[in-house]
């Protein structure tokens, strides 16, 4: 990243030099040729809970950028329902009203190559990560921020506490009155979790 950023900085230095000498057209040509504006396309992205869960399971409920274990969203919601003061939830995850575990431990889908940068919006370009990592990565490519993609987890191991979730919902069916828990329970029923 260093050399590329340095060379881009030097392109802008050349542009400023042209400004100083009154050569606005030259400055424009330098930018167009050496560091052109390329707008990021904001393509709509959407996946179903079932598609997301399939990716979470494929990745072993592990963050593919850090390797840290993540927790099934339905399980986080059960904890919040049982301990609302100690583990509060906010539907928009407001950090002053919601336990930070939702940001650190709830899995989400990230596009390895951002859709806005030419990546596909399908499972070949989707990986599991936390909301913290997803927000930090934003529309950057991995090499631009010095990250790498960890391999998929194979075999039985961490299940993101999905086993606990299934046992708890079976033991306490009224949990399904919560829309979020019901949504994730339906997705879990549709796939086999290792």
Model-derived features with residue positions:
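A boundary/linker detector
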Residues: 1-54, 60, 67-73, 170, ...
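Alpha-helix boundary/N-cap detector
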Residues: 3, 7-10, 152, 156, ...
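Residue-level detector of short, conserved catalytic/binding motifs and their immediate flanks
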Residues: 53, 59-61, 110, 128
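Short, conserved, surface-exposed binding loops centered on an aromatic residue
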Residues: 54-57, 99-101
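Short cysteine-rich clusters marking metal-coordination/redox-active sites
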Residues: 63-66, 130-133
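Histidine-centered nuclease catalytic patch
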Residues: 68-126, 140, 147
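A contiguous, mid-protein "functional segment" used to position or interact
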Residues: 138-169
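Short flanking/linker segments adjacent to small metal-binding domains or redox-active Cys/His motifs
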Residues: 167-194
């Amino acid at each position: 990243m260093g050399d590329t950023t340095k060379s881009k900085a030097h392109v802008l230095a050349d542009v400023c030099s042209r400004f100083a000498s009154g050569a606005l057209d030259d400055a424009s040509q330098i930018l167009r040729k050496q560091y052109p504006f390329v707008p990021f396309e904001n393509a709509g992205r959407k996946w179903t809970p079932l598609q997301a869960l399939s990716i979470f399971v494929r990745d072993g409920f592990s963050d593919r950028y850090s390797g840290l274990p993540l927790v099934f969203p339905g399980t986080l919601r059960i904890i919040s329902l049982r301990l609302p003061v100690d583990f509060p939830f906010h539907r928009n995850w407001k950090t002053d009203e919601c336990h930070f575990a939702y940001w650190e431990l709830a899995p989400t889908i990230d596009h390895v190559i951002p859709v806005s940068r030419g990546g596909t919006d399908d499972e070949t370009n989707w990986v599991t990560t936390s909301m913290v990592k997803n927000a930090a990565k934003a529309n950057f490519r991995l090499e631009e921020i010095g990250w790498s993609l960890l391999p998929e987890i194979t075999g039985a191991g961490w299940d993101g506490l999905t086993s606990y979730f299934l046992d708890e919902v079976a033991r306490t069916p009224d949990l399904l009155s919560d829309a979020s828990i019901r949504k994730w329970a339906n997705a879990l029923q549709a796939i086999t979790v290792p």
